[in-house]
Amino acid sequence: MDNDGTIVDVTTHQLPWHTASHQRQRAFAQSAKLQDVLYEIRGPVHQHAARLEAEGHRILKLNIGNPAPFGFEAPDVIMRDIIQALPYAQGYSDSQGILSARRAVVTRYELVPGFPRFDVDDVYLGNGVSELITMTLQALLDNGDQVLIPSPDYPLWTASTSLAGGTPVHYLCDETQGWQPDIADLESKITERTKALVVINPNNPTGAVYSCEILTQMVDLARKHQLLLLADEIYDKILYDDAKHISLASIAPDMLCLTFNGLSKAYRVAGYRAGWLAITGPKEHASSFIEGIGLLANMRLCPNVPAQHAIQVALGGHQSIEDLVLPGGRLLEQRDIAWTKLNEIPGVSCVKPAGALYAFPRLDPEVYDIDDDEQLVLDLLLSEKILVTQGTGFNWPAPDHLRLVTLPWSRDLAAAIERLGNFLVSYRQ
């Protein structure tokens, strides 16, 4: 009705939003900064798996290191402590994390031989290591800065480097040498724009545990070129046989080193998202960078508080992971079965993992003519309802590897690898 009392037909009266609806709608595209950001562990093939599950199919997920679905439960003492702490975990904490948890991190590394001393102000807690990696690279990198990352790698490092405007540069690890980093290749990749060196040890996806000699050579190169050291050591307690883990910071007490670790794997609480970052070495020339990490920590307000209460009891209590990796332990048994069964498949070879939760088998190109390993993974999913991840998803340059987690029960793991072998016998692209 108009002001003069006349009834208006709203079906023909041109209202502003009515006119706009006849115009071309504005498109909202993905940001250009995501153009080079990939995370194939939960990529397109994972979406196909979700569709199959919705249709009622049972999918054996060997694509992600998530212990809980395979019957690996957190120690009871961790669960009890979190439940008891819930009434006190309703508000925000300090942006770096609660003091008791940060003290527990400091105490943990006092027991690591040669690890440089640091205090609670050098510790940042995070919603898993993943958040802390992203924060660190956002605080560090300007457009075009280069970060040396192993190939194969845990792809979050490459994705987060690209997201921060940096350029990931991959140095090769040598399969013939147990997946140890190729020092000559690493040195050849260093340029004036190189800012940091990422070391993933024990390695995901290969399971390699780096020798003291290799780590020393890597540190020597970083020292020569004044590179920041970024040490991803989330699997440092998941070691098999006589493997010994050496923390990178312990070899480089004179260098700025950021060590990343957390509860997700060794303490089987991946869903809690409880990680930490410890900064060691001389900090006087990195105050602005560290201030940037603090700024980003403030912006996210704080890590989730209930999970922070798991850190002190986890680090100070019985280390139950040892029961799983020593002789008779479930993780060791499953590692052995995966390695043995994979090497029994004609044309497939696998370096024996010395740590972590994965196998990274090679498909001999002389036997398997694979041009597209993502298509191979999709075809395996559709045929066998087994979900793995293609090797190129870990920034390996050739389509000749797969990554499988070794978390399923031995019987299920052996059956899955047997089905993989049967599938490969007749597979053609």
UniProtKB/Swiss-Prot annotation:
Keywords on record: Aminotransferase, Cytoplasm, Pyridoxal phosphate, Transferase
SUPFAM superfamilies named among the record's database cross-references: PLP-dependent transferases (SSF53383)
Enzyme Commission number: 2.6.1.2
Keyword Transit peptide: no
Class of this enzyme: transferase
Pfam families per the UniProt record, alphabetical: Aminotran_1_2 (PF00155)
Superkingdom of origin organism: Bacteria
A Gene Ontology BP annotation from the UniProt entry: biosynthetic process
CDD domains, alphabetized: AAT_like (cd00609)
GO CC terms: cytoplasm; plasma membrane
Similarity remark: Belongs to the class-I pyridoxal-phosphate-dependent aminotransferase family.
Subunit structure: Homodimer.
Protein name: Alanine aminotransferase
Phylogenetic lineage: Bacteria, Bacillati, Actinomycetota, Actinomycetes, Mycobacteriales
